[in-house]
Amino acid sequence: MNTPERFQLLSKTALVTGARRGIGKAMAIALAEAGADVIGVSQNLQKKGSEVEQEINALGRKFWALQCDLENRKDLYNLIKHVCANLPFVDILVNNAGTIRRKPASEHPDNYWDETIEVNLTAPFILSREIGKHMIKRGSGKIIFTASLLTFQGGINVPSYSASKGGLGQLTKALANEWAGKGVQVNGIVPGYINTDNTEALRNNPDRYSSILDRIPAGRWGEVEDLKGPVVFLASSASDYINGTLLIVDGGWMSR
C-alpha cells in the first residue's frame, strides 16, 4: 500500500458524535471526503436534510442521522443498541460531542458538574467500551477523542469542563494500553483555540481574545477545517502504530 492509499477510508464507516455543527461537522465531512460513510449523532440533528448530511451525500457517501441526548444514559444505550443491530460495523468512533458550563469553582453547582462529566467523559467511555468490544472481536478499529487544551491546563471558571477533559486524556491512554495489542488504536485530538460556539465568550472578551492570540505563534485562531487532516490521519491506516497519543492542533500555543 502506497502512502496516499494509507489515508483512504473507502469501505469504512465512522460514527461521529456532535456531528451537527462546529468541529464535529468538519470531522464528519473530512472522513467522508476520505471515503468513509458516516453515522452522525447529535441531540438536535435533523433526521433528514441537515447541512452535514447534504454535504456528505454530495460526496457520494452514505449518512445516517441519529438523535441522542448523551446526558441521558437510557438514550445512550438505546443508541448503541440500534447502531450495533441495524447499521454497518463501526470502524471509526469519534467521541467529539461536548458541553461546557462557566461559573467559578466556589459557585459551580452540582448540576453543572454532573451534566458536564456525563456528556464529556462518561458517555465517551460507554460508547468506547460498547463499540470497542466489537472492534476487539474483529481485531481492528480506531477510537478518537476530542480533548482540549484544558486536558493539560486548569482553565478559569470551568472546573467541570477541565476535569472532564483531563479525564479524557487519561482515558485515551488507559484504553490504548489495553487495546493496542488487540488491533484497536485509541488516540485523542487536542484542538487549540478554534472559532466555534464554545469559544464565543472568549472571543467576545477583548482582553482574553488578545492575550490568547498573542500566545499563538501561528498568529491566528484556528478554524474547524484545521482539524480535518488530523482526524483523517488518526482514522486511517497511516496511524496504525500510534497509540495513546494526544495530537495537539493549536497553532503552537502549547509551545509558548
Feature names for model-found ranges:
Residues 20-21:
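Conserved glycine-rich cofactor-binding loop
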Residues 180, 185, 242-244:
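Short, small/polar-rich loop/turn modules that mediate ligand/substrate recognition or access, typified
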Residues 148:
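Residue(s) in the substrate-gating loop at a strand-loop-helix junction
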Residues 104-105, 109-117, 212:
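Substrate-binding pocket helix/loop in short-chain dehydrogenase/reductase
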Residues 128, 164, 172:
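Active-site helix of classical SDR
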Residues 125, 140, 220-249, 254:
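C-terminal substrate-recognition "lid" of short-chain dehydrogenase/reductases
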Residues 36-51:
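Conserved glycine-rich Rossmann-like NAD(P)H-binding loop of the short-chain dehydrogenase/reductase
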